């Protein structure tokens, strides 16, 4: 009877340890938000590039 209790205890410990993840997900969400803001600024500059070029050309023609 004691042998079956020991086996059950070892099995329960194994299941408990197997269900715990060794490397939890990092909680660096603030850095992801900062990175996303940087990407939005970069994309905005890329999209505004042709418009700025047209304005520069128009200003040069106006002189």
From Swiss-Prot:
Keyword GTP-binding recorded:
no
Q: Where in the cell is it found?
A: Secreted
Query: Which residues are propeptide?
Result: 23-26
Question: Is Signal included in the keywords of this UniProt record?
Answer: yes
One Pfam family this sequence matches = Cecropin
The alphabetized list of GO BP terms reads: antibacterial humoral response; defense response to Gram-positive bacterium; innate immune response
What does the record give as the function of this protein?
Has antibacterial activity.
Which protein is depicted? Hyphancin-3D
